[in-house]
Amino acid sequence: MSHFARKLYPLASVVLFLFAMSTALRADQKFLSSDDAKEHDEPQKFLPDYDKLVKGKDADWVYFPEGDLKKYKTVLVKEFEHNGKGREAKEAASYGKEYMEQWLQKQGFDVVEKGPADLTVEGNVFNAWEPSGAARVWGGWGANPGVGTELIIKNKSGAIVAEIREKSKGSTVHDAIENGLEDCAKSIAKGK
């Protein structure tokens, strides 16, 4: 074997190994193969395409079939629903519309109260929790209140242009949904 071939063989092996690893890692970034999808107390009934959600940059799980949403300017946000159990889910859903509008405005979208709008956002709270007093004292950040939110974003014709699923924490349920919707708005603005 020539000197050049002996030097090239290890380099080619490393490149092939890295390519194989990157492919394997990308496969693990699908929602349905994640630990998040295995939570039995978190319904998966709101979004039509859970199988297409991939790991997002700001929000946990995203699907943008058309890519980024920069061409859209006006947004109408509907009242949020909740299919999570308990008063916390209902409470979090009541804050959803207000916070979604606030964070979309900060991302440069014009929020309108009535249609027609370029985009319509529909939201759902699939889970919300408030730990008990002892858990808050002993559990640290892991025992903070949290909210699970899902968004469907449609264009004027009613076609889905984005789906997002996010779990977030905060000092209160009120704070947790705001934190989550801030991440969702960033993902909407960036399209990833």
Residue spans of the language-model regions?
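Short alpha-helix boundary/capping segments
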Residues: 88, 92, 168-176
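A structural "domain/chain start" motif
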Residues: 26-98, 192
